[in-house]
């Protein structure tokens, strides 16, 4: 996998260095094709530059975002990796605008998942794990949103393409794994060979469907731990208060602060000790719980973790929040495979990931608003569309998988769309970078204010 990424980056570098030299050698037909594609992309961007108005491109983007939310809702990954290519390629907006829209759409879809997890009668959410992940994830989101304003669009395009390629590879591998498990369970059930025990087969079936259906087979009613949920809200609110004090891009907030002044950066830097304090408290609480009940911890709502894994989680959540803030994706597609590789059960991973995506996506959306995001009315409409699609998707996918017994179909669907998005985003991103370069536009880093 690392080799593929290195080759991918080398190809991008070769393209950037030799593009000017190869331009003269291109056949006339290639010039005409590139010119027509460039004209089409320019016309889309010009129509979306000032204000997004109702058009065929916007309607098509809304339909595709509805389908994307429909597919990704049951997996608990947020869907940001699908929303951004749709907005950039179909609606014609730039990558930064698409990232801000994606934050709103991911928020809308995650609300549907949170409602399903909290009030669906399932004991799957690991609130202790969420308490351990949330502070550093919100810190990463804050830094990521600033990076979105500072980094040039060509660099964001490269980072997003690499990230999406990695996520696509992990998703397809998971799909193959699920397909093999489904086939094995089907063969054993069909031939009536319970050599490994019916209980073990049922357990594998439950684990197989849990990441997508969030373990609909779990029938135990769960009480919502309001204390832990309240602590999570307090953590979110603590970061939110800092954003309110900071104000918008003009420095207008509860208190008047000069944008990018000394007070501005001191206020933002308070998020670092805040995240460290909350993370330390969560680590101490998790360690004390596991020391008090080392034998029956797995039977409780929490997940038993070794010390090295517990220390690794804050760094993982920070990276997920950072990329989520830059791309507006919520971070679910990054943190979900990392949690699975760390030994977290799939059903707990899916439920907890969708819960964390809600917190990170809402924080990204709030920051984009405070930083002067445009076309907010359209973003609200897209968010509501994704909310409805996610609710419908949770119901339809559960029925479809229950009927056909192939939960891996959804994994392959998401992986296929993500792979296609990687190719399209890389192609059109390279074309946009080349267009800006030829036009002599500034392609360097920008000030955060």
UniProtKB/Swiss-Prot annotation:
It is a multi-pass membrane protein. InterPro entries: TM_pro_TauE-like. It comes from the Eukaryota. The lineage of its organism: Eukaryota, Viridiplantae, Streptophyta, Embryophyta, Tracheophyta. This is Sulfite exporter TauE/SafE family protein 5. It holds the Pfam family TauE. Belongs to the 4-toluene sulfonate uptake permease (TSUP) (TC 2.A.102) family. GO terms for cellular component: membrane. Keywords: Membrane, Transmembrane, Transmembrane helix, Transport. It is found in: Membrane.
């Amino acid at each position: 996998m690392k080799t593929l990424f290195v080759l991918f980056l080398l190809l991008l570098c070769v393209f950037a260095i030799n593009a000017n030299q190869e331009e003269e050698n291109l056949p006339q037909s290639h010039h005409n094709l590139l010119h027509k594609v460039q004209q089409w992309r320019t016309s889309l961007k010009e129509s979306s530059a000032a204000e997004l108005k109702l058009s065929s491109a916007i309607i098509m983007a809304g339909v595709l975002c509805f389908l994307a939310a429909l597919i990704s809702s049951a997996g608990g990954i947020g869907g940001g990796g699908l929303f951004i290519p749709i907005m950039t390629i179909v609606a014609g907006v730039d990558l930064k605008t698409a990232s801000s829209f994606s934050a709103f759409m991911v928020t809308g879809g995650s609300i549907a998942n949170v409602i399903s997890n909290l009030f669906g009668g399932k004991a799957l959410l690991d609130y202790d794990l969420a308490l351990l992940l949330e502070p550093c994830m919100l810190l990463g989101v804050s830094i990521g949103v600033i990076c979105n304003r500072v980094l040039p669009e060509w660099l964001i395009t490269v980072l997003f393409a690499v990230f999406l390629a990695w996520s696509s590879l992990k998703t397809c591998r998971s799909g193959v794994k699920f397909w093999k498990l489904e086939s094995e369970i089907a063969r054993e059930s069909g031939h009536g060979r319970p050599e490994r025990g019916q209980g073990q087969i049922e357990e594998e079936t439950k684990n197989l469907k849990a990441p997508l259906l969030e373990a609909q087979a779990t029938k135990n009613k769960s009480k919502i731990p309001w204390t832990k949920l309240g602590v999570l809200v307090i953590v979110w609110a603590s970061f939110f208060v800092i954003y309110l004090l900071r104000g918008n891009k003009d420095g207008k907030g509860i208190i008047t602060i000069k944008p990018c002044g000394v007070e501005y950066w001191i206020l933002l830097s308070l998020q670092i000790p805040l995240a460290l304090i909350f993370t330390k408290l969560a680590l101490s609480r998790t360690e004390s719980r596991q020391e008090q009940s080392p034998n029956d911890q797995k039977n409780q709502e929490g997940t038993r973790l070794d010390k090295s894994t517990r220390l690794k989680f804050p760094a993982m959540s920070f990276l997920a929040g950072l990329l989520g803030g830059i791309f507006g994706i919520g971070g679910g597609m990054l943190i979900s495979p990392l949690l699975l590789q760390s030994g977290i059960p799939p059903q707990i991973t899916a439920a907890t990931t969708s819960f964390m995506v809600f917190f990170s996506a809402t924080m990204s959306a709030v920051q984009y608003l405070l930083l002067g995001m445009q076309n907010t009315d359209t973003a609200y409409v897209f968010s509501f569309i994704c909310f409805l699609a996610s609710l419908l998707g949770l119901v339809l996918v559960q029925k479809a998988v229950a009927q056909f017994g192939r939960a891996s179909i959804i994994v392959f669907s998401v992986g296929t769309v993500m792979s296609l998005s990687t190719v399209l985003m890389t192609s059109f991103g390279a074309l946009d970078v080349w267009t800006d370069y030829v036009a002599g536009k500034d392609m360097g880093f920008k000030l955060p204010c």
